[in-house]
Amino acid sequence: MILTKDTLRCLFKSNRWKSNTNVENLHFNPNSIDITLSPHYYTYKETYRKVIDPRESNIEDFMVLNQIDDYIDLLPKEFILGSANESFDCSEPIGGIAYVQMLDGRSTLSRLGISIHNSAGFGDYGFNDTFTLGILNNSPYSIRLYKNMRIAQVYFTDLDDSIVLERYQGYGNNKGYPGLPRLGKDRF
């Protein structure tokens, strides 16, 4: 079951669920909340090494942190690792049912050729950080992305009550910065 706007608004207004953004400033849709683009993003460096080996590479050798002043023009086929401004804590079960967050790109941007992907698609139970967003321009044209523009939407869906709930142990406190991939032999 996916929660609707009225239920979400009630949960956040009552502080049963929490957000780092004032509830009056959240962008509620019929069954989701729009999230906005943080000014911080990573791009790939020009480097002599052309292969990233997930078992051996140090990702900091390949990526550089940037900041959007007002906007960036995403070139055709260009990829950036961005982040959302908003974070949500929905770890308190409602009526004995636990919920997780699910992220999708906005259809308007998709129709322009922008793919927004959260590497996991779902936030694990207890996830309460900002989503890291893989943003790719599939269009033959440059597309302008503005700081704080609505970039994706988050849905809240229930978990099967037969599972043992384990709290999220992921990437840590990103707080508006994209989480870089963790590489190394122990990860693959």
Q: Can you say where each PLM-predicted feature lies in the sequence?
A:
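DUTPase catalytic domain/fold
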Residues: 1-188
